[in-house]
A protein has these predicted regions:
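Nucleic-acid endonuclease domains
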Residues: 1-84, 89-181
Length: 181
């Protein structure tokens, strides 16, 4: 598709859409317990304030894909039954409806050193018991296809000033979670 405004190019890429899931009380409770035990991680953008939301994303994926815990928490979060090592990236949101296909999924600049096979992206609502599994991308494909932003850069597609150097992809550019092995 031809695009006359180069800033709008990001709207035309990919067909993936986020999958809405209901968040259970059990998932909330497990995530809260784990977050309290974890404390503050080095390089945490929110100084540990979002640990519970991150853990909730992990609990959702654990249940959906029947994953087991990582035996190397510094490199990945969960392992699928087939042995695929997943790093779960969760963003909290005040939205109550599915994120738009052009919304961004991010991996911080220091995370590419992690030894995982794929990144899985979620958005978790702070207002309702819903989450959206935005999709996944193999680490190799993500690092090849994502757009890099340095701290202080402004993303021309949405005017967002980047707070930490990161790699971004739109939800529409990810692979649907049902394609994970």
């Amino acid at each position: 598709m031809a695009v006359s405004n180069k800033k709008m190019k990001h709207f035309t890429q990919g067909r993936n859409r986020a999958l809405e899931v209901k968040v259970t009380t059990d998932q909330y409770n497990r995530a809260e317990k784990r977050a309290e035990e974890l404390g503050v991680l080095r390089n945490s953008i929110t100084n540990g304030k979002s640990n519970g939301w991150g853990m909730l994303g992990e609990e959702i994926i654990r249940d959906l894909l029947k994953c087991t815990d990582s035996d190397d928490i510094y490199n990945y979060d969960l392992k699928t039954p087939s042995g695929m090592r997943l790093e779960i990236k969760t963003k909290k949101t005040s939205m109550v409806t599915a994120p738009k296909p052009y919304f961004k999924c991010s991996v911080c600049n220091h995370n590419p050193r992690q030894r995982c096979d794929a990144y899985v992206f979620l958005r978790v609502s702070t207002k309702v018991n819903k989450a959206w599994i935005c999709g996944f991308k193999s680490k190799q494909d993500f690092m090849k296809e994502a757009r890099f932003f340095k701290k202080g850069d402004t993303d021309a597609s949405n005017g967002y000033k980047v707070h930490a150097s990161c790699y971004n992809m739109n939800i529409s550019e990810l692979d649907h979670i049902n394609k994970i092995r």
